[in-house]
Amino acid sequence: MKQNKIEVYGIPDEVGRCPGCQSVTKLLKELNAPFTFYKVLTNNGKIEYDRPLIVSLAKRAGFTSLNIRYPVIFINDSRQKNIKHFKETLISLGYDRDIIED
C-alpha cells in the first residue's frame, strides 16, 4: 500500500474534549496509518487558539467562517466531508475494513 498523506486538524486531548478528534486519531493509530495532527488550540498555562493555523485551514478547506467544527481531515490533500466519508476513503485506499467498521 502506498503511503497516504493524512492530516487531521483538531482539538488535542490536553485542551478539551473533541469526541470526533479522539475517534479519528484512535482509528488511525489502530490502522498504523501515519498522520499529522495539527492542534488548533494550545494550553500553555491558558487555552489559546492558533489563529494563523485556523485562518490557513479555513482558506485551504474553502470555509467562509472561522467557526469550524472539528476534526477537519485531509487525505492526499482532499478534504473529507465527515467521519463517514473519511472511513469510506480509508477503505477505498486499502486500509483494513474490519478495523474501520468495528
Swiss-Prot record:
InterPro entries: Thioredoxin-like_sf (IPR036249). Gene3D superfamilies: Glutaredoxin. It comes from the Viruses. This is Uncharacterized 11.8 kDa protein in Gp55-nrdG intergenic region. It comes from Enterobacteria phage T4.
